């Protein structure tokens, strides 16, 4: 198995993000995929989100930002919740009617216990096996896909480095698989 890859093909990304909504309906899994793709959070941070982190129960509305302490780095991160993420959260919230202390991505049998990383991996792998041609897809692909498309949309390198907490843009390019894409273009465009 190779290095985890982002989902580069836009149609495959569309199919991947909607699999648990349209093909095999399961709102928890759908929300996991959509939130992962739209926040660039590591799976450990996604799985530790509680409903009170994304929904203000006093004001009865979704929050505009997530404030988390990253599990891996211990750093504080303040992340805007975009409309796609809010829409997925809304659908799941309406189905679940959760308590503020429940985990957003909880076990089916106990909403006060987070989904395991291995179960999250199985959810992502099942989705990818039906929707993408890329074999090296894992939970980390959600984060890499966010970065890959941010790069494609022209997000400044320094900002991407900041989002991923990398010390150099070279590391960020390698992390997102951009370095290989650029190298491939050189070979594909030189036809002697």
Regions found by a protein language model. Name each.
Residues 5, 71-90, 102-125:
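C-terminal catalytic core of Y-nucleophile DNA break-rejoin enzymes
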Residues 48-76, 83-85:
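Conserved tyrosine-mediated DNA breakage-rejoining catalytic core shared by Y-recombinases
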Residues 54-56, 156-176, 181:
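Short, polar N-cap/turn motifs at the start of nucleic acid-interacting alpha helices
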Residues 20-23, 122-158, 162:
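Short, basic (Lys/Arg/His-rich) helix/loop patches that form interaction surfaces
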Residues 35-48, 153-155, 166:
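A short, glycine-centered helix-capping/turn motif at helix boundaries
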Residues 49, 75-76, 112, 129, ...:
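Catalytic phosphate/metal-binding cores of nucleic-acid and nucleotide-processing enzymes, i.e., regions
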Residues 10-39, 43:
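Basic, Lys/Arg- and aromatic-enriched nucleic-acid-binding interface segment
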Residues 9, 15, 77, 177-192:
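DNA/chromatin major-groove-contacting recognition/catalytic segments
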């Amino acid at each position: 198995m190779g290095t985890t890859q982002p989902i580069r093909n836009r149609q495959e990304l569309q199919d991947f993000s909607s699999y648990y909504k349209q093909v095999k309906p399961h709102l928890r899994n759908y929300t996991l995929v959509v939130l992962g793709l739209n926040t660039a959070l590591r799976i450990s941070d996604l799985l530790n989100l509680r409903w009170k982190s994304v929904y203000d129960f006093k004001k009865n509305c979704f929050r505009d930002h997530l404030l988390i302490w990253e599990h891996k780095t211990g750093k504080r991160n303040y992340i805007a919740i975009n409309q796609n993420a809010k829409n997925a959260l809304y659908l799941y919230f309406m189905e679940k009617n959760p308590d503020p202390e429940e985990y957003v991505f909880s076990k089916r049998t106990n909403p006060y216990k987070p989904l395991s990383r291995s179960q999250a991996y199985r959810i992502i792998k099942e989705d990818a096996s039906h929707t993408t041609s890329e074999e090296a897809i894992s939970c980390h692909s959600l984060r890499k896909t966010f970065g890959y498309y941010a790069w494609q949309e022209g997000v400044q390198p320094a900002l991407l480095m900041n989002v991923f907490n990398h010390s150099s843009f070279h590391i960020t390019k390698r992390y997102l698989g951009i370095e290989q894409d650029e190298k491939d273009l050189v070979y594909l465009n030189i036809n002697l």
